[in-house]
């Protein structure tokens, strides 16, 4: 799969963009704040419905945006996808729109409209239409950050591979909110939630949670093997990079998940929160049996995150038969020459679309530059180089 065209309207710095993209490697270069990262962010948003940088979605809508015919301001993102060389072109689109409040002023909330081949669909239906793997400087948080970062890594990867996973995860989070609300309000009112109510939510949580757990464990088994090989190639080190899924319950089916919840009934009532499940799990990332985030050098941490991202791409390819689009955001400037050359060699593959951003061309060899498409970005304008 590759993205043949990207269209943006009032998305961050881009008032109007209609950009044709090549199927191979494309380098966007220019000064900081020129709009390079926004290209990658737009594709990531179209693939996952999540923003990499915005804390609230209204930040994605350009300040200068104006609605049509009295409508509130909106941003539009659309991409044309070529799944296979002989396959029919597909289109995906997101329209993100501000809302008017009761007083007629703009409210802080937004609405989101999603279309696939011009037909309105749900957000869950969009995920997996376009598969991407994002490499970014903040990827170090995968090994140094909180467990939520590593859970997100697994969830974003699996959601793009498996439509059932994204639905199970969504259902799990919905049930978790309801169950936590029941526990919390019961504690605040000093009145225990009924066993019947909790048993109902236990079963619903277990039904969704067991699938999430099973797929995460299965993915980590494969990612462990892939990342071990890739780390050795990237670093040239004989240290083993190992991944291990750290679950808060060993449950493998609905009854065992329910039993684990029931064992914690008293403590959960006292604390007003669900204490076990996929939302509490973690991913252990170790070199020579020591956590990379705590004991690894900066170089080891960076090589580990690269191995994780490349493993993510290989997992997507092996599960779907389709190579994801690779998005590399100003990453090469942080790598030494050896790792930079290895990464560039790795990503230049047939049927592998790769979009790279950089501030200048000094990080790339003349031979590499001769094989790719270059585009210069300057304050929201893009020029072929």
Swiss-Prot record:
- Show the Pfam families listed in the entry: SMC_N (PF02463)
Q: What is its main location?
A: cytoplasm
User: Keywords, A to Z?
Assistant: ATP-binding, Cytoplasm, DNA damage, DNA repair, DNA replication, DNA-binding, Nucleotide-binding, SOS response
Instruction: Name a biological process GO annotation.
Output: SOS response
**Domain of life, per lineage:** Bacteria
Which PANTHER family has this protein been placed in? DNA REPLICATION AND REPAIR PROTEIN RECF
Stored PROSITE patterns: RECF_1, RECF_2
Q: Which family does it belong to?
A: Belongs to the RecF family.
Q: What does this protein do?
A: The RecF protein is involved in DNA metabolism; it is required for DNA replication and normal SOS inducibility. RecF binds preferentially to single-stranded, linear DNA. It also seems to bind ATP.
Q: Write the protein's name.
A: DNA replication and repair protein RecF
One annotated GO molecular function is: ATP hydrolysis activity
In which residues is ATP bound? 30-37
Q: Which HAMAP family match?
A: RecF
Q: Which SUPFAM superfamilies match?
A: P-loop containing nucleoside triphosphate hydrolases
């Amino acid at each position: 799969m590759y993205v043949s065209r990207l269209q943006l309207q009032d998305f961050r710095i881009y008032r109007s963009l209609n950009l044709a993209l090549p199927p191979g490697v494309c380098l966007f270069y220019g000064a900081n704040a020129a709009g390079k990262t926004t290209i990658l962010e737009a594709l990531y948003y179209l693939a996952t419905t999540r923003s990499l940088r915005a804390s609230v979605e209204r930040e994605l809508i350009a300040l200068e945006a104006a609605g049509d015919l009295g409508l509130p301001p909106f941003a539009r993102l659309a991409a044309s996808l070529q799944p296979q060389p002989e396959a029919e072109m597909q289109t995906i689109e997101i329209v993100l729109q501000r809302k008017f409040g009761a007083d007629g002023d703009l409210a802080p909330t937004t609405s989101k409209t999603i279309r696939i081949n011009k037909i309105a669909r749900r957000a869950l239906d969009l995920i997996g239409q376009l598969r991407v793997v994002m490499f970014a400087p903040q990827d170090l948080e995968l090994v140094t950050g909180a467990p939520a970062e590593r859970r997100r890594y697994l969830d974003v990867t699996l959601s793009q591979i498996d439509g059932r996973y994204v639905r199970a995860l969504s259902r799990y989070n919905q049930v978790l909110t309801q169950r936590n609300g029941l526990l919390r309000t019961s504690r605040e009112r000093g009145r225990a939630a009924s066993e019947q109510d909790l048993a109902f939510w236990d079963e619903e949580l277990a039904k969704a949670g067991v699938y999430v757990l099973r797929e995460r464990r299965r993915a980590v088994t494969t990612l462990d093997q892939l990342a071990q090989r890739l780390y050795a190639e990237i670093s040239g080190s004989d240290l083993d990079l190992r991944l291990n899924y750290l679950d808060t319950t060993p449950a493998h089916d609905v009854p065992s998940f329910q039993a684990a919840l029931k064992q914690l009934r008293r403590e959960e009532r006292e604390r007003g929160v669900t204490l076990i499940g996929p939302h509490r799990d973690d991913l252990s990332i170790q070199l020579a049996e020591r956590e990379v985030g705590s004991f690894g050098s900066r170089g080891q941490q960076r090589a580990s995150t690269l191995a994780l991202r490349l493993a993510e791409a290989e997992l997507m390819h092996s599960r779907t038969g389709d190579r994801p689009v690779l998005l590399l955001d100003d990453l090469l400037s942080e790598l030494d020459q050896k790792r930079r050359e290895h990464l560039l060699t790795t990503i230049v593959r047939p049927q592998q679309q790769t979009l790279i951003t950089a501030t200048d061309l000094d990080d790339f060899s003349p031979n590499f530059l001769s094989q790719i498409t270059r585009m210069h970005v300057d304050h929201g304008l893009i020029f072929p180089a």
